[in-house]
A protein has these predicted regions:
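Conserved ANL (AMP-binding/adenylate-forming) active-site segment centered on the GW(Y/F)…HTG consensus within
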Residues: 379, 448-477, 494-495, 507, ...
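Structural core segment of the AMP-binding/adenylate-forming
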Residues: 126, 130-214, 326, 333-334
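Conserved pre-ATP/AMP-binding loop-to-beta segment of ANL
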Residues: 67-69, 192-194, 204-239, 246, ...
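Conserved AMP-binding/adenylation subdomain of ANL enzymes
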Residues: 258-276, 286-329, 342-345
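AMP-binding/adenylate-forming catalytic core of the ANL superfamily
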Residues: 138-164, 178, 323, 330, ...
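Conserved ATP/PPi-binding loop(s) of AMP-dependent carboxylate-activating enzymes
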Residues: 414-418, 430-465, 505-507, 606
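Gly/Ser/Thr-rich phosphate-binding loop
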Residues: 298-301, 328-332, 341-407, 420, ...
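AMP-binding/adenylate-forming catalytic domain of the ANL superfamily
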Residues: 190, 194-196, 535, 568-593, ...
Length: 628
């Protein structure tokens, strides 16, 4: 079957299509109804079927490949490496599941996980899935008030954390941040389970705090039966990044999530049992939830949990892992690759990367220069894909297991099965034609694996995502265009649009032009208020060579060259009013550019919540660059 036929069946016959895909996982009780869409926009998949994510990730592989690698935990910060076979991982997950039950955790209870990227974090999530507890991971290093807001929203009976993590040689004091958060929160967990890594001193609260290692010792060898959950019970809550006010918890189911991930591993990522999948993300983000914690194990692959930066202690650290563990598929973000662009390619190429078959990139738009550079450097195809926290798995990609169409630089590909993607005119709501820019939306029902609702707030779910147009369609809040061959191109968020004297430009368009300059390593473009034009674009550039930072004449020359390049590629209406050179740009710890923060600084406004920022010194660079 061609991909086109596969896709059309998913849109025209969704119930039959997804019933067939559901055979990819084990069901303890068969479902009686594939889809219940009687209360749109809410969709219920595989109704009355009973299954379990942990069983499908671990237990069902025990007979086929018990001694195959399942989990590889690597920390470039502590220089530790730990490996677990499926049998060993099964033992560890059972022990932790027994620990959770001893602390009073029951089916449907929330367990908040605030941990570094260590094996215990992954094992804890699988243990929650095993007993039917709902896990909610808060990205490590979030400031206390952000953690407190999530505690109050999720109301966990237990929090699992650690003394500290590390990033680029810097210690991140998880326990201290957590204690501050709990003191600010109205809801109080019954217990806090703590992994002591010996990285930082931590005060313990008597009667509340429990040592992970000591409790584990009491539960070694325990066997905890799987809780068979109805498909639409909640598996996890994941809070979207960058929210203000009340946190927005994306609620996901059990059966739909398992089926969607299992299908994607075969059709999109080409994962095969016995292989090794390296997703260089964090379990606190959706990519890590889906393609570190669950999807590789569902496919019988080993999954790598990595603590550290792509450049620490050197720029070869990822590639050493690829070589050592014979990684066949790797998943990262464009930002990480742009960082690596600043280093000599010889440092990467000196490693044996012959096992690596493809590199997947997602999380933000992938510019063509970065895609070309990494593909040539690694000598592997690069496959972009586009999705969101809410979708849980790719909305657009090239389904490499089904589709032989080539990748097209700058495009994440075509809509994936189950996603009836449309581009709509923002004013009229009418469908856009070829090469016409519109908002990317998805016709309901959303396919399995996507957001069920916002935790505890159905009204907000409908109002936020389904009320933008006159008819109910799911709004992604991303601009896109579609070419004559059906490839889509993401132009940035709908709030990342610059209106310069009536010309509407996506920041992505200008950034892509500037990125094509040979002296540019990375760039961020924002729109700032202008008395004459309404808005003008300004660019902050990380140069490949430091002379643009040290010599004003060189910087001025480079600025003129970049402006001329934008003139030639977009037109002078897209030319930045200023190009400033910096050595780093403000980003979250997950690598996302903080464009709104940059914009606020440029306009002299309060930059607001900075809890997700990786290095606050980058903000000083923005301010200093503008003053010079």
């Amino acid at each position: 079957m061609s991909f086109s036929e596969f896709y059309q069946r998913s849109i025209n016959e969704p119930e039959q299509f997804w019933a067939e895909q559901a055979r990819r996982i084990d069901w303890q009780t068969p479902f009686t109804q594939t889809l219940d869409h009687s209360n749109p926009p809410f969709a219920r998949w595989f109704c009355e079927g009973r299954t379990n994510l942990c069983h499908n990730a671990i237990d069902r592989w025990l007979e086929k490949q018990p001694e195959a690698l399942a989990l590889i935990a690597v920390s470039s910060e502590t220089e530790e490496e730990r490996t677990f076979t499926f049998r060993q991982l099964h033992d560890e997950v059972n022990a932790v599941a027994s620990m959770l039950r001893s602390l009073g955790v029951q089916r449907g209870d929330r367990v908040l996980v605030y941990m570094p990227m260590i094996a215990e974090a992954h094992i804890t999530l699988l243990a929650c899935a095993r007993i039917g507890a709902i896990h909610s991971v808060v990205f490590g290093g979030f400031a206390s008030h952000s953690v407190a807001a999530r505690i109050d929203d999720a109301k966990p009976v237990l929090i699992v954390s650690a003394d500290a993590g590390a990033r680029g040689g810097k210690i991140i004091p998880y326990k201290k941040l957590l204690d501050d958060a709990i003191s600010q929160a109205q809801h109080q967990p019954r217990h806090v389970l703590l992994v002591d890594r010996g990285l930082a001193k931590m005060a313990r609260v008597s009667g509340r705090d429990v040592d992970f290692a000591s409790l584990r010792h009491q539960h070694i060898g325990a066997r905890v039966p799987v809780a068979w959950l109805e498909s639409n019970e909640t598996s996890c809550i994941l809070y979207t990044s960058g929210t203000t006010g009340k946190p927005k918890g994306v609620q996901r189911d059990v059966g739909g999530y398992a089926v969607a991930l299992a299908t994607s591993m075969d059709t999109i990522f080409g994962g095969k049992a016995g292989g090794v999948f390296f997703c260089a993300s964090d379990i606190g983000w959706v990519v890590g939830h889906s393609y570190i914690v669950y999807a590789p194990l569902l496919a019988g692959m080993a999954t790598i949990v990595y603590e550290g930066l792509p450049t620490w202690p050197d720029c070869g650290v990822w590639w050493k892992i690829v070589e050592k563990y014979q990684v066949s598929r790797m998943f990262s973000a464009p930002t990480a690759i742009r960082v690596l662009k600043k280093f000599p390619t010889a440092e990467i190429r000196k490693h044996d990367l012959s096992s690596l078959e493809v590199l997947y990139l997602a999380g933000e738009p992938l510019d063509e220069p970065t895609a070309s550079w990494v593909s040539n450097t690694l000598d592997v195809p690069v496959s972009d894909n586009y999705w969101q926290t809410e979708s849980g798995w790719p909305i657009m990609a090239i389904a490499r297991g089904l589709d032989d169409r080539p990748t097209r630089l700058g495009s994440p590909g075509v809509p994936m099965y189950g996603y009836n993607v449309q581009l709509l005119n923002e004013v009229t709501g009418e469908p856009c034609g070829v090469n016409e820019k519109g908002m990317l939306v998805v016709e309901g029902p959303l396919p399995p694996g996507c957001i069920q609702t916002i935790w505890g707030d159905d009204d907000r779910f409908v109002e936020t995502y389904w009320s933008l147009f006159s008819r109910p369609v799911y709004a992604t809040f991303d601009w896109g265009i579609r070419d004559a061959d059906g490839y889509h191109f993401i132009l940035g968020r709908t709030d990342d649009v610059i209106n310069v004297a009536g010309h509407r430009l996506g920041t992505r368009e200008i950034e892509e032009s500037i990125s094509s300059h040979p002296g540019v390593a990375e760039v961020a473009v924002v729109g700032v208020k202008d008395a004459l034009k309404g808005q003008v674009a300004v660019a902050f550039v990380i140069p490949k060579e430091s002379d643009s930072l040290e010599d004003r004449d060189v910087a001025h020359s480079q600025e003129k060259a970049i402006m001329a390049l934008v003139d030639s590629q977009i037109g002078n209406f897209g030319r930045p009013a200023h190009v400033w050179f910096v050595s780093q740009l403000p980003k979250t710890r997950s690598g996302k550019m903080l464009r709104r923060t940059i914009q606020a600084i440029c306009e002299g406004r309060d930059p607001g919540d900075l809890t997700t920022i990786d290095d606050p010194a980058s903000l000083d660079q923005i301010r200093q660059a503008m003053e010079e």
